Each structure stands twice: as C-alpha cells, then as structure tokens.
C-alpha cells in the first residue's frame, strides 16, 4: 500500500499515514503471543483505509481485524485485539497510553462530578500515593477482547450520551477497593485495599454489574437482587410498582411475588364489584419494569411468582408465549411457578389438584410456605367445602401444561417452596421464604408493603460476588478469597443508599450476602472430571463444603469484630442448624463423600459470636462477569469452545480457558447425554449453599424419537430435581441448531442477551 494517504489525527491535524508506526503498534500487541500473524492483521486493515481517515478509525479498524481472526486454532488473537483495544481506550480516556497519577485522576473526576466526593475526603494525598503504588496497569493486558468490550460497554465510567470514557480498568478496581474499605481503621485499611485490589484485578473474585459500574460514583445502590412481595390490595400493588421503578432505575433486577392477588371474578367490597384478576396488574408491573433502562447500563427485568394452585394458573402459564393477543399476554416478564410436595404427590397418584383464589381460603397461602403439614390439612378441608369457589384439574394435565410452556418459552421457572423453607438459612416460623428473585438463586424473607414508606413491610436485598474456581490451586485458597468477599460485601450494606425505607431496614438487620462461583466448567476440565459420568461428584462436594465453611468462618470472625446482624435470632444458624444438617438426605445415595473440615469447632464459634450475615452463598448466572474474567459462565458447561456474543461493535468471540491444553477434557453442553449428571452436581452444591442455585435444564431434540422431547422426560427431570432437594430451576434451554449453522465452527456458542444479562441478579 502506498504511503500517499493522509490521516486526520485526534487533534484535527492532517499528516501522511505512517505505516511503520502501525506496524510497531501491532508488533507490541503481538509480543509473547502464539500463532499470531502481524502481516495478516495489517493486510486486513489496509484494504479498509481511505484518504483522510481518522486515526481513531484506523485504530478501530486494526482492532476489528485482529478480533475477526480469533478462532480455535488461533485463540491468542483475543489478547492481541484486547491490547489494541486497551491502547485505544486509554487514548480516549487520558489522551495518551500511560495512565495519570491516581490522586490527580481522582481529583479531576471529583471536580467533574463523576466520582463520589467522599473519595477525596476519606483519604489523604499520602494514602493515594500508597494506593498508586499498588496499581499494576500491566494487568490490563490480561483481558481478553470480549472482556475489554464488556468493560467499555458496561463498567468503565463514561458519558453515555457522548461516549466519552473517563477511566481505565485498574483505576476502576483500586477505587472500588478504596470505597469499600474506607470505614476501616487507618492502620489496617491499606492492607485490605491492597489484598482486595489484587484479588479482583487478577479475576480471583468477580463482582456484579451494580458494583463494577457504580461504586466510586455518586450513585450508591449496589444490591444486585431485589425481592418485592405484593399483598392483595390496591395500596400494596401501587407501592410494589413504585418500589419496582425506584430499583430498576438503579441497576437492580426484580423478583415480584404476586401470588396473593385474588383471581378473576372474586368479589370486591362484599360483591359491590368483581375483581379483574391478575393479568391487568401484571401488565402494570411490566410497565414499571420497562420504564427505566437502569442507568443506561442494562434494561429492566423481573420474574413474577405465583402458586401452582392459583385459580388463574391456566391463564397465567401462557402469558409468555407467542400465541394469543395483547390483551391476554404479558410477554416482557418472566414467571416462576411455586410447587410443593403435595402437588407432586397428586400427580404421581393420578389425582386432581384443586385451584383456589387465595382470597377465598384463609391461611392457605401462608401455610403453603411456612408449614407443610398445616397446608395439607386445610387444603383438603377447603377442597371439601362446597361453599368455596374452586376448580379441579388433573394434576398430570396441569404439570404437562407447566412443562409445555417451560419448554416453549424457556422462561417458566420452578420454585420448590417446601425445600426453600426446610433447607433454609432462616427459621421458617420467624422468617418465611415466599419467593425468589429474577434469576432464581436468592431465597430471602419478604413482607408486603402497603405504601412506599411502610416500615412494617420488607423488601429483601442481596449483594453478590463470585469466586473464580478456575484460579484456585488449593481449597485453602478459598479462605482468603472468602474473607475478602464477605468483608467487602458487608461494607457495601453501610456504604450504599436505599431508595425505599423497608429495604434499608431489611438489608441492615439481615445483612444477606450471596457469594457464588464462576469458571466451574474450567475447574472440572483442569481436574479431568466431567458433568455427566459422576466423576465430578466428590470434587464438587469437597469444593462446596470448603466454600461454605470459609464463608461462614469469615462471617463469624466479622461478627466477633463488629457484632452479629440484629436479626441473627431469626436464622437457623442461631439454632445451631446448618445446611449440612437440613439437606435432602437423598443426596447421600448419589455421593458418599464425607465432610473434611472442622464443623464442630465452627459451630461452637458461631454459637459464641454469631454471624455478621444471615446468608452467605447463592449460585448465580454470570454471563457478563465471566467474560471479564475470561472464565466459563457460573456452574454451566460451555456450549462451545468459542462463545460469540452480539454487541454494537459486532460479534465478540471468546475462547474457553486453556483451550489447547484442555480441549479433550472440557465437556460441552450438547455432548452431555441428559440432565441427570448436572442435576446431581447441583444437588450436591445445594447441600452446602444456604440460598439457592440458578440451575438450568437442557434438551437436544435430536436425541429423541422424531426429534420431539417426550413429556415424560420433562416430568422425570422435574421429579429428579425435587427428589434431590433442588430448590429452584431457572432456564430450560432447547438446542435449536442456531449455533450449528454458524459459519465459524461446530463448537461455537452463540450467546444472546437475555433477562439475566439485562437484569441484575447476575454478576
């Protein structure tokens, strides 16, 4: 190519194109990487150059040229493209490649109103000098290309109208650390800041979107999950809607318990009017959820919960599907059906399920969650009462309808309310679990509010993070990571603001945390065990025992230091009951691995000092944060060795960790013959996890006769999940062949934005 083209520089000046300069930058970006051809990137770039092209466009062109070469055979292009993108980001943020001094950067951002002014008030110049020495900007070069694009799109502070970037990744990490430990004593806080910075900047701890995009800014709401319960009256419905708007606007995903709302045709004011039923109010909730785009970072999303025995269930189950008309569909919410043992027994015995309006059957709704024995007694009593409006339906027909809609939409979720209360962190008589959250991994107590300032209501909040299993060398590594995670998240509860008063009361008195994992598939591959054949069971048992043990130990140590949470007496831990005491004993038939840690000593310490946090663990989806950490998603098997995610910058490709070394050890999703191996691992995890797990079921029609998934298979898997004590089921994924039709490779995963990347219970 001739050197005759002119370029327009960032300052507006024109000069002749300097191909040698481009060549040097590409060589720098390729240094130390394998299977990289600088000349190929140059050739792909040059054919797109034109006269007076801006240097910004040149940079974006060479980034895309490198990114387009990412493949199974040449995975290192994801790092070359990332380095070029980091170079570009720093030029946009700072006007140069070298980042400025931390103190002067913070001072400038506070003056611009971008950073929280407390950053300057809480730390001295000398402390910023010390923090600046902790920062290792070379760690930017460890990001994959997909990670850099996610950082740019969702996490780095920017003007979302003009696109101006204000910071780079290492400043994001050090300032999150500084904000979270600002209230610690001066003599110890620098130590915690450095340790936490090192853990998050090397991807050992993964943080959720609200924390990554919000901590250090003047907007202080970082709880990922918000659970709101609605009572059966207009005041509560309106208060619920108001709370939804407040939290959706501040980056949170929503779980809505609407199960108490009475059924269509129910009398109002002793028959003066009849009720319009659930659907109009679900539409009201949908409008509230979609009213805000969560600060430009993500769109609002919510899951609505209702009991299987609700009189309107046949109409509610079809709200998500593509049939019907606008009046009888509410498609932009997801739904979860709440089920207990009695309903399964009715199905297995070929009996009927009786449907009621909750308003017609006093105490039934309450006992459905809090007392299974009393629920059964009064359910049968109400069935026999001829004066109560009801409808009987064959149990198998109702379960088939549930599973048909779950298969059709993928977004009808399941909550086993008896497991959620019998195997809970909470004493179900004092703090009943009546719903979950957007992504089905949070199980916290809620109470309806009758107005937005109702101090007697309870909105549950959960603050999330995850441990990167792929980066631990020994289970003892989890001790330090658990300590840092618990301490950092606990500080967030005091650091953040609360848009609704009853949410603050709940968050501060319960101090619930949900710490999960990412990179489980890589962890299994590294240890040469698999999802499907049972070989991962013992490793999973040992790993999740260690996670829960060290999380509880960290919370107990914090309670010794700062005091236990004020509602600790409402937990099972207060009674000396741990998840290892209340788990479904059917798990023992699939895994006989013993406990390895000193639980008796930990019990004694918790009895003496209590716990700082009511809950510690929850296993959430982690699509976005896994990309940042170049990890596999949560506990899920990858669909392909390369994942592809659509973005405004085109298709983002990311290769699974250590692909070349571990290709034969990874078990891809559609290679797994059925759900049983995966569900058994989830059940083993649930033995230790004190909240719940976003567990999915997956079906490849090609494995079945006539490529039709038999209903009996869907029901069987549901029964297995219940039998093994699994609390919740999230997505049902059906292989549609889309990823097979990609022109790239058969082992490519196509990731679509879903409610969990747009909702906030993910990390």
UniProtKB/Swiss-Prot annotation:
Keywords: Allosteric enzyme, ATP-binding, Deoxyribonucleotide synthesis, Disulfide bond, Nucleotide-binding, Oxidoreductase. It is an enzyme of class 1 (oxidoreductase). The record marks 730-731 as: Important for electron transfer. The keyword Heme does not apply. Under complex allosteric control mediated by deoxynucleoside triphosphates and ATP binding to separate specificity and activation sites on the alpha subunit. The type of nucleotide bound at the specificity site determines substrate preference. It seems probable that ATP makes the enzyme reduce CDP and UDP, dGTP favors ADP reduction and dTTP favors GDP reduction. Stimulated by ATP and inhibited by dATP binding to the activity site. The record marks 756, 761 as: Interacts with thioredoxin/glutaredoxin. Gene3D superfamilies: 1.10.1650.20, 3.20.70.20. It comes from the Bacteria. The keyword Disulfide bond applies. It catalyses: a 2'-deoxyribonucleoside 5'-diphosphate + [thioredoxin]-disulfide + H2O = a ribonucleoside 5'-diphosphate + [thioredoxin]-dithiol. The record marks 225, 462 as: Important for hydrogen atom transfer. Its EC number is 1.17.4.1. One of its GO terms (biological process) is deoxyribonucleotide biosynthetic process. GDP binds at residues 209, 437, 441, 623-625. Residues 5-95 form the ATP-cone domain. One of its GO terms (cellular component) is ribonucleoside-diphosphate reductase complex. Disulfide bonds join 225-462. Tetramer of two alpha and two beta subunits. This is Ribonucleoside-diphosphate reductase subunit alpha. It comes from Buchnera aphidicola subsp. Schizaphis graminum (strain Sg). The lineage of its organism: Bacteria, Pseudomonadati, Pseudomonadota, Gammaproteobacteria, Enterobacterales.
